[in-house]
Amino acid sequence: LSLRRQRQMCIRDSYDIYPDKAIERELYVSNTVGADQNNKMKKIGIFLEDMDHVTVDGNNSLFMFHGKMTTFATIGCEDVEFKNFAVDFQVPTVIDMTVESVEGNTATMYIPECYNYEVAGTTIKWYSDVSPYTGQRYWSISDLSGYHTQREDTVQGIKFGAGNGNAALKGVASIEDLGNHRVKITYNSKAGEVQNGMCFQSRPTVRDHAGTFFWKSKDIKMTSLDIQFLHGFGMVGQHSENITMEDVDFEAPKESGRTTAGYADFVQMSGCKGAININNCTFAGPHDDPINIHGTFNTVTSISSDRRTITVQYNHHETAGFPNFFEGDEIEFMTKGNMITVENSVRTVTKVDGPDGMGGNMGEGSGSLTTIKLTLDKAIPADVQVNQHVVENITYTPAVNISNCEFKEVPTRGILVTTRKPIVIENNTFDGMSMAGIYISDDAQGWYESGPVRDVTIRNNTFTRGNAQAIFIEPTNPTVSTEKTVHSNIKIKGNTFFTYNKRVLDAKSVDNLTFKNNKIYRQDPINGDGSLS
């Protein structure tokens, strides 16, 4: 569904949206498939392009998507609101199966009704639904061994991001289809993870689509949405300004028997500016981080003789192909080794030659999806050297407010955020995080997710049943400067921590760190229900 002229779209009831008739575009999205040409084409269900002042009001409708696709997207839009609807997939691309009973070396597994499957000897084949246009299935998988599998203890509400992988289908002697979406698995040797209430969640590892996508857009708002499943890589905001989420709940429907609502991250804001406001939202059942807000470092690979023109490159294989800089943007250089900013290195971009994000070129781009040439207003400092320094677009760094949200059933971190603009994280609950509840990094070694924080307030949050540090501040600087810090001005006040053997705070390379008026309680790990010993 492509919207170009309408200014308001009000709909009601349930709608099936198929990739067969969807808009298709070549797009390059941060943290997904990088320059991979096998996955450059994106199917988009609801697509707004170059439109302003639009409201998409679902009137409590359900949008049921099929196959693999982006649910809704804006490109070059301003003042757009999506509200009052639910999003789900007919057959989610994450396969959930839950242990109902265990007896000796056998286990009975429940497979939710949305999945199509067939027992084949000692394995199970899985199928999508059938296209009404072609009569063909959108996808099928005959063996989950190549999938990434996580586990969720549905009794305790705790998710495990690592361990014995798909233990449910290891050491299998036989599988019997019992009907009614139950299978009986007999094991030669049953793994300890196969126990009552354990849900095994298996997904592909290729992020071929974004779940939703907002690019070169401004003043985007999502209100009262139920995100029951997103295929691919969550809600991605890329080089957009002012994105607001109010009462957006990410959670599989209780009656569905499923436990997974997201293929990877739920919310990924990459290189945005203005304000990112996330309020009164629920994040339950992702396969990666619920919220990740960051910029992107590019490594300096060449410098002209007058030091006014530089070539930079993308470094991680999942990020490439889109413009990370625009004329008029300010940039700043950092040293890769210690992650310290280079003094007096802020410059203004006057020309960009590189990929345009749609398979073409900006300026006199070479056609490379991984390199960008920048012309600057004046020469860069002599300290900046090839392959030793990275550059960040500091124009596209947002202020962030995350408040009154609930994070649960998470296999990774709750919130990742790195931006130099003010950050406020308040009145949230973090339950059972497998890793840190709040993680502040700044990375020019692996993901190249920038940048330093300068003003952070973490207050009045509650952390329970965490399996790691509640708050973790760790830039990935292999060399720690003895003169300067990467981060500064972090205030942690009025929070409540329930823990049994983990740190509530672990910090590195921070100037002016305040930890004040917080309450720390010893939690009973045996009860596992938040009660105290």
Residue ranges and their predicted role:
Residues F65, F89-Q90, C114-I175, A320-G367:
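Ser/Thr/Gly-rich low-complexity blocks that favor extended beta-strand/coil architectures
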Residues L1-R7, I11:
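Single conserved hydrophobic/aromatic residue that forms the stacking wall/gate
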Residues G157-G257, D265-M269, I276, N280-T282, ...:
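Alpha-solenoid helical-repeat scaffolds
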Residues R5, D16-T55, M64-K83, V91-T106, ...:
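Extracellular beta-strand-rich solenoid/capping regions of secreted or surface-exposed proteins
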Residues F65-T71, V91-I95, H209-G211, H231-V236, ...:
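Short glycine/acidic-rich loop motifs that flank beta-strands on beta-rich extracellular proteins
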Residues V155-R207, S345, K351-V400, K408:
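Small/polar beta-strand repeat architecture
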Residues D52, C77-E81, S217-K221, Q238-T244, ...:
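Short "repeat-start/strand-capping" segments in structured domains, especially the N-termini
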